[in-house]
A protein has these predicted regions:
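Short catalytic helix/loop segments, enriched in acidic residues and glycine
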Residues: 2-18
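Alpha-helix C-terminal capping segments
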Residues: 15-26, 71, 242-244
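Short beta-strand scaffold segments in enzyme catalytic cores
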Residues: 18, 66-70, 206-209
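Short, conserved phosphate/pyrophosphate- and ester-handling motifs at nucleotide-, phospho-/glycolipid
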Residues: 20, 169, 232
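Conserved N-terminal subdomain of the carbohydrate kinase-like
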Residues: 26-109
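Hydrophobic anchor at the start of a short beta-strand
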Residues: 26-27, 53, 133-135, 215
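Conserved beta-alpha-beta core of the PfkB/ribokinase-like small-molecule kinase fold
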Residues: 110-188, 195-197, 205-206
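Conserved phosphate-binding/catalytic region of the ribokinase-like
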Residues: 126-127, 178-259
Length: 259
């Protein structure tokens, strides 16, 4: 209600982990939260939702990331990050589990915004690929979080070089390619990076999907949005829950039921 704030669990990778668990998939959260009320709250919620939290570290020296999300009349959001730097950005290689073949690792660019999390995240992506697993990357750009904004593009590009699939908004795609034409921007990104799939979400207009040799558009049902927070994460969760049931990445036609 007006003048009140609601405490909600969140963070894009946590949202995806919960979404996968709700779709009867096996998911785990790798990361750090503060050993504080917000961190314990997130740990409790993820555990209750069926997410494996054995690799969620409670950091006694840094506070849990806390974000105020404001909504406009159309349900669109603005973000204010209250804790800088927060516990999640102090993830180290010692916090990473052993990865295995056929597993999926999903992450966003906030993990790249500061050391030591940046090198740890890139190391995790490489380790998952080396183990025979797959990597999903959603830039989910939040420039205000970055210690050095000039590092955003090179870090995002480094992650795209290690990803099997990527999910971007149109705005993120155009920013990365310096283009304003959707099909050519997608083709440009696919030519620059070794992605198997590129997904560009378009809100009420659905999603564009690209492989190295093909593109298609998948429309969505019309809805009246109340709050778009986590909508992209819900899309990724559904996609990964479906892909995780397969031994290999499918051809584009075989991917359609997941979209």
């Amino acid at each position: 209600s007006e003048g009140r704030y609601l405490k909600c669990p969140g963070g894009a990778p946590a949202n995806v982990a919960v979404g996968v668990a709700r779709l009867a998939g096996n998911s785990a959260f790798i990361g750090r939260v503060g050993a504080d009320p917000f961190g314990r709250f997130l740990h409790q919620v993820l555990t209750t939702e069926g997410v494996d939290t054995s690799h969620m570290r409670l950091d006694a020296h840094h506070a849990t990331s806390t974000v105020v999300v404001d909504l406009d009349a159309d349900g669109e959001r603005s973000f204010t990050f209250l804790v800088r730097p927060s516990a999640d950005l102090f993830l180290t290689p010692a916090d990473l589990p052993t990865f295995h073949s056929q597993q999926w690792l999903h992450l966003c660019s906030i993990a790249l915004s500061r050391q030591p999390s940046r090198d740890t995240a890139l190391q995790a992506m490489q380790a998952m690929r080396s183990a025979g697993g797959y990597v999903s990357f959603d830039p989910n750009l939040r420039p205000d979080v970055w210690e050095d904004p000039t590092q955003i593009r090179p870090c995002v590009e480094a992650a795209l070089r290690l990803a099997d699939i990527a999910k971007l908004s149109e705005e993120e795609l155009f920013w990365l390619t310096d283009s304003t034409e959707l099909d050519s921007a997608m083709a440009q990104l696919m030519a620059r990076f070794p992605l198997r799939y590129l997904f560009v979400t378009q809100g009420k207009d659905g999603v564009r999907v690209s492989t190295a040799s093909n593109q298609c558009h998948v429309p969505c049902r019309p809805v009246s949005p109340l709050d778009t927070t986590g909508a992209g994460d819900a899309f990724v969760a559904g996609l990964l829950a479906a892909l995780a049931t397969l031994d290999t990445l499918p051809a584009l036609d075989d991917l359609m039921p997941a979209l």
